[in-house]
Amino acid sequence: SFPFHPVGQTFTQRKDQTLSNITSTAFAMGSKGSSLDSQPKLGFNPKLYQDSKWCHDTPGTVSEDQVINIFTQEEIMKVLPMLPVVPRSISLKVGQTLFLAGVARLDVLTGPGSEKWQNHPLVLTIFASDDLPINIVETEQAEEFLSQGLKSDILKVPSSRQNPQRLEEFPELQGQEFELYGISDEESSCDIVLSSVGWLAVTTRVTLSYLVKAWTPGGKGLYLRDLAFLPYSVNLKGSKIRGTPYYGQSRIFIP
């Protein structure tokens, strides 16, 4: 959890008692000459306990694979989904690169060896915050695109809008190669985990294989999940948008 504002106190002794009165009383505890002893004590009141509001903050673990700790508060608001995640699907061919904002990247290095299937696309279903834009470029232009995109702030994260030195502080993207195999055009075979940013579900025809390279800041949290977490999510994609590698989004019922 990331509290951005003070958590107030809901217990009061009287309806007209303010939070400032309560906190001043709390800070007066133990001081000489305090009138605390003359004030009525606030004991346990089951009804008051039931009607009050609570914020429970459970302790988390710190992992070297987490990238969430490198983001500023402004960036966290974009990286962490504030609404239910709606999967977005794209198709990539050999020699193309996917950028997820400026915090993750995927290159398709090689594809099926068969001439019949060498142009068959690799479908990726992206599970990440909608505030992280998706861009697809030719791999040979990827470095230039990333450099220009970060300077112009179109990638959104990392952002140098408030701190011009932010791009110098932000860890460079580092990559790791993975070999992928397909099982069906209607079922994802595996996931590429991108640390705290999200993951990519991989879908392609059975027997086809690809070599890809995934990137995250500092190369942290890159894993291949052998079994897709949501293997049939690829079927939620809409029709292919003509002339682009993007699929439309089907309407998803969220209760």
Residue ranges: model-predicted function:
Residues 2-255:
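Helix-rich effector regions associated with P-loop NTPase G domains
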